[in-house]
Each structure stands twice: as C-alpha cells, then as structure tokens.
Swiss-Prot record:
Broad EC category: hydrolase
InterPro entries membership: Pep_tRNA_hydro_II_dom_sf, PTH2
Secretion signal, residue range per the UniProt entry: none
Subcellular location per the Swiss-Prot or TrEMBL entry: Mitochondrion outer membrane
Protein name (Swiss-Prot/TrEMBL): Peptidyl-tRNA hydrolase 2, mitochondrial
Membrane topology: Single-pass membrane protein
NCBIfam families in the record: arch_pth2, PRK04322.1
Species for this entry: Bos taurus (Bovine)
Keyword tags: Hydrolase, Isopeptide bond, Membrane, Mitochondrion, Mitochondrion outer membrane, Transmembrane, Transmembrane helix, Ubl conjugation
GO biological process, one term: positive regulation of anoikis
Gene: PTRH2
Function as written in the Swiss-Prot or TrEMBL entry: Peptidyl-tRNA hydrolase which releases tRNAs from the ribosome during protein synthesis. Promotes caspase-independent apoptosis by regulating the function of two transcriptional regulators, AES and TLE1.
Tagged with keyword Hydrolase: yes
EC number: 3.1.1.29
Cross-link Glycyl lysine isopeptide (Lys-Gly) (interchain with G-Cter in ubiquitin) placement: 76, 81, 95, 106, 115, 171, 177
Length: 179
C-alpha cells in the first residue's frame, strides 16, 4: 500500500506524474481527432500535377461548399410555410448527395454545412436555375407543395441547389438577393 507521506507529497507537488499524464492524454486526443476528421499532416499529402484535372479541381478550387435554397417570391408564402418548404428541399438535397457523393457531403459538413436562402421572382426563374445547375453537374431538388394549406397543389415552391462547391453554385445563383 502507498504510504501516507507519498500521497501527501504527490498532492502538494504533483510534478512529473501529472505532466506525463497530461502529455499522454493530449497525444491520444490529438491522434483520435485526426483519425476522426481525416486530417493528415502536410508532409503526407501528395502534390497534384496541375496538368491533370481531378474531380476536386473540376468541382471547385476554393475548397468551400454550400447549399442554396431558392424560394419563389411570387407565391407570398407565410414564414412557416417557407421554413417547411426549405426544410423539405434541404433534406431532399442531403439524401441525394449522401447517395451520390459521400465525400462531397463530408467536405460540406466539415465546412459547417452552410445554407443560404435567396429569392426568385417566379416559377420560370426557378426552372431556369434548375436547368443551369444541372448543366454544371450540381445536385438539385425541386419541391412541389401538396396544396393542403396556403397554395395550389403541385406549385413549385423551393429549389435546393447543392451541397456543392461554392464557386459553381455562385455561377447559378450569385445574382439573386437574400430572402
């Protein structure tokens, strides 16, 4: 058994044992977080040849990702209705990207899952944005309302674009105003 004098000495002057325990905890925590979030030291990352186009360079060079929700402004939906329709679009887009490109989804989540809501004047603009986004290879989700409350059944209410590279999404929606 440990003598009382050793316990008292440790309690008054913890010294090397506490230092060793702290360093060990820090190393384990750092290693665990690095493994969890896939961070690698710069020395282990290969440089890419600028002459070859990879999926990352095609998708976006800024390294930033976002999702845009485009709301039709001509329908004059209430705040709750807009929130519900945007939620439908966000969940639909999330499910699509989860199936089609889990790596991109991980990058978007790592960026903090940014979502921006903008407004479009009418349905025609919504369809034009959808077409442009598809041409650029972006994930899209067009929401049609069931028509049980405020608006006509089948009305196209919200277009979700992304998650995807911010620079590509800005080519489609950069001119729209915030909702």
């Amino acid at each position: 058994m440990i003598s009382r004098s050793l316990v008292m000495e440790y309690l008054t002057n913890p010294g090397a044992l506490s230092l060793a325990a702290g360093v060990a905890c820090g190393v384990c925590l750092g290693w665990g977080l690095r493994m969890r979030f896939g961070m690698l030291p710069k020395s282990s990352v290969r440089e890419t040849n600028p002459d070859t186009e990879t999926e990352a360079s095609i998708l976006g060079e800024s390294g930033e990702y976002k999702m845009i929700l485009v709301v039709r402004n001509d329908l004059k939906m209430g705040k709750g209705k807009v929130a519900a329709q945007c939620s439908h679009a966000a969940v639909s887009a999330y499910k699509q990207i989860q199936r089609r490109n889990p790596e991109l989804l991980k990058e978007w989540e790592y960026c903090g899952q940014p979502k921006v809501v903008v407004k479009a004047p009418d349905e025609e603009t919504l369809v034009e944005l959808l077409t442009h986004a598809k041409v650029l290879g972006l994930t899209v989700s067009l929401i049609q309302d069931a028509g049980r409350t405020q608006i006509a059944p089948g009305s196209r209410t919200v277009l979700g674009i992304g998650p995807g590279p911010a620079d590509l999404i800005d080519k489609v929606t950069g001119h729209l105003k915030l909702y």
